[in-house]
């Protein structure tokens, strides 16, 4: 009897050990994502919650429905966030010989943070940590343009229409527009006071009525670092020059920028933009977007 009791006890202990081992090694994908908290990429459950709120907001108006349709046509807002940070090379070339802006960059699409590296020398960097702009201290005079303004500017072009999920955004359907023998639904985007550095900016986005994809971006620049309040550059019109699909997301590969004429047509061609090396970077750590020790905070606009 004693021998049987000992044997049964050993069996029970073995079963308990196996059960505990199974319990400690079984995790859901979201739990795993929570554990790997050093990554900028967020858990899928966070994405699902944010996307559900966004869909409800966009479905509440005709303009919003068109934007949501466009997001779906470009691969879907959920897929956009699930892919994690986005990296690309953005080369902005004015045709009048003024300053070129040419950098590699990685963007935290969830939190709108950015880190740029100069095309000619990738040790020269600047960025936006979500609160402050910065530049590597030894290179404050290297960049011949306003790096605070430029930290997120390329992102707000390539990430259309997904960036319209941000707060403080207002949408207005302004009707149909014709461009290059295609018909588009035109949506005007404005911003609440206090939204970003330039809340007086606006965009007019053209979404092709059949494919629902973006074809044209019209915009103004009212950045206070360049202009007194209430003033801005004349409106510009950007034509998308191509689209590539990366991890299921349709993104532009370049733009031609024109002055907008009085009859809302493309006027003088003033800038050529090319975008390449486009790839999502899901392994990027949160710390990548913090201000480096060898950098200085940019004061003012």
Go through the PLM ranges and name each one.
Residues 49-52, 56-58, 62-141, 172-173:
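N-terminal mature ectodomain segment of secretory-pathway/periplasmic proteins
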Residues 16-19:
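C-terminal motif of bacterial Sec signal peptides marking the signal peptidase cleavage site
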Residues 27-57:
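Post-signal peptide N-terminal segment of mature Sec-exported envelope proteins
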Residues 184-289:
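Gly/Pro-enriched, hydrophobic low-complexity segments
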Residues 34-36, 81-85, 104-116, 126-134, ...:
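Short, solvent-exposed coil/turn segments at beta-strand boundaries
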Residues 58-63, 127-201, 225-231, 301:
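Flexible, processing/modification-adjacent segments and terminal tails
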Residues 1-8:
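Bacterial N-terminal signal peptides that target proteins for export
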Residues 21-23:
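Bacterial signal peptide processing site
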């Amino acid at each position: 009897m004693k021998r049987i009791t000992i044997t049964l006890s050993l069996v029970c202990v073995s079963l308990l050990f196996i059960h505990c081992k199974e319990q400690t090694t079984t995790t859901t994908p979201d739990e795993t994502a929570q554990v790997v908290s050093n990554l900028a990429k967020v858990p899928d459950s966070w994405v699902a919650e944010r996307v559900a709120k966004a869909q409800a907001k966009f479905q509440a108006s005709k303009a919003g429905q068109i934007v949501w349709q466009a997001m779906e046509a470009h691969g879907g807002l959920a897929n956009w966030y699930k892919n994690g940070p986005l990296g690309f090379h953005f080369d902005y070339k004015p045709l009048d010989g003024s300053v070129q802006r040419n950098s590699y960059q990685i963007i935290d699409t969830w939190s709108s943070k950015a880190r740029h590296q100069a095309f000619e020398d990738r040790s020269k960097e600047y960025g936006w940590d979500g609160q402050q702009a910065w530049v590597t201290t030894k290179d404050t005079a290297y960049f011949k343009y306003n790096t605070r303004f430029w930290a997120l500017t390329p992102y707000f072009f390539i990430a259309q229409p997904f960036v319209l999920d941000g707060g403080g955004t207002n949408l207005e359907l302004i009707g149909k527009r014709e461009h290059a023998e295609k018909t588009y639904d035109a949506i005007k985007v404005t911003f609440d006071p206090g939204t970003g550095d330039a809340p007086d900016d606006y965009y007019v986005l053209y979404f092709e009525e059949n494919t629902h994809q973006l074809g044209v971006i019209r915009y103004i620049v009212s950045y206070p670092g360049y202009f007194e309040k209430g003033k801005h550059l004349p409106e510009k019109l950007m034509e998308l020059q191509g689209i590539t699909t990366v991890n299921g997301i349709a993104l532009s590969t370049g733009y031609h920028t024109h002055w907008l004429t009085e009859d809302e047509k493309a006027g003088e061609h003033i800038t050529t933009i090319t975008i390449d090396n486009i790839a999502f970077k899901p392994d990027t750590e949160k710390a990548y977007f913090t201000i480096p020790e060898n950098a200085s905070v940019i004061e003012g606009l």
